[in-house]
Amino acid sequence: MKISEEEVRHVAKLSKLSFSESETTAFATTLSKIVDMVELLNEVDTEGVAITTTMADKKNVMRQDVAEEGTDRALLFKNVPEKENHFIKVPAILYDGGDA
């Protein structure tokens, strides 16, 4: 399956990435090869092969859900540079807006 350069540009725009023309061409070629290799898996005869979802023998290894004493809030906030309404205030890393 051929991945076009236009598809690469479209996904790059949605991902807020920018590539040069040579990078776009290289990505289109590489992604096309990857998709072709994955499509080869459809040709494998799996008749009679049991469904396998994991190779690990362990299933849902979890600890007991036990309530524990938390850290004293005053002690926790002692070294916090900025707080607001009993919450630790941190710099914003996500902004509202954009094309995605």
UniProtKB/Swiss-Prot annotation:
Q: Which InterPro entries match?
A: Asp/Glu-ADT_sf_sub_c (IPR036113), GatC (IPR003837)
SUPFAM superfamilies registered for this protein in UniProt: Glu-tRNAGln amidotransferase C subunit (SSF141000)
> Keywords in UniProt for this one?
ATP-binding, Ligase, Nucleotide-binding, Protein biosynthesis
Q: Which GO terms describe its molecular function?
A: asparaginyl-tRNA synthase (glutamine-hydrolyzing) activity; ATP binding; glutaminyl-tRNA synthase (glutamine-hydrolyzing) activity
Q: Tell me the superkingdom of the source.
A: Bacteria
List, in alphabetical order, the GO biological process terms annotated in this UniProt record: glutaminyl-tRNAGln biosynthesis via transamidation; regulation of translational fidelity; translation
| Catalysis: reaction(s) | L-glutamyl-tRNA(Gln) + L-glutamine + ATP + H2O = L-glutaminyl-tRNA(Gln) + L-glutamate + ADP + phosphate + H(+); L-aspartyl-tRNA(Asn) + L-glutamine + ATP + H2O = L-asparaginyl-tRNA(Asn) + L-glutamate + ADP + phosphate + 2 H(+)
Main EC class the enzyme belongs to: ligase
Transmembrane portions of the chain: none
- EC nos: 6.3.5.-
| HAMAP family, per database record | GatC
| The protein's role, per its UniProt record | Allows the formation of correctly charged Asn-tRNA(Asn) or Gln-tRNA(Gln) through the transamidation of misacylated Asp-tRNA(Asn) or Glu-tRNA(Gln) in organisms which lack either or both of asparaginyl-tRNA or glutaminyl-tRNA synthetases. The reaction takes place in the presence of glutamine and ATP through an activated phospho-Asp-tRNA(Asn) or phospho-Glu-tRNA(Gln).
Family assignment? Answer: Belongs to the GatC family.
Please describe the quaternary structure of this protein: Heterotrimer of A, B and C subunits.
Q: What is this protein called?
A: Aspartyl/glutamyl-tRNA(Asn/Gln) amidotransferase subunit C
